[in-house]
């Protein structure tokens, strides 16, 4: 929850409860780790990436994720996960 709260305070996401609940409930594998690492790395909101693939690439380059294949294979399995990856990816650039 703290990671999602920080990301919302920075303006990166605007639905921290949605993502915190999804992470805590285990609805998306590794989501909690993604949010925590992103919150440790991101200092401010920036323009989103155009695609989830670009977001994943930026997150890999920033050291936030090390499992790009998982995220590329699963970004369309949970509502708005693709948009989250775009937001986080843009913010780490």
Give a label for each model feature.
Residues 1-93:
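Extracellular cell-wall/glycan-interacting regions and their flexible linkers
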């Amino acid at each position: 929850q703290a990671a999602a709260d920080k990301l919302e305070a920075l303006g990166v996401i605007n639905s921290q409860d949605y993502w915190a609940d999804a992470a805590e409930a285990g609805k998306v594998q590794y989501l909690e780790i993604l949010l925590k690492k992103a919150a440790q790395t991101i200092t401010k909101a920036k323009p989103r990436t155009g695609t989830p693939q670009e977001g994943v690439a930026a997150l890999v380059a920033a050291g936030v994720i090390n499992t790009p294949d998982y995220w590329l294979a699963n970004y369309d399995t949970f509502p708005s996960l693709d948009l989250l990856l775009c937001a986080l990816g843009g913010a780490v650039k």
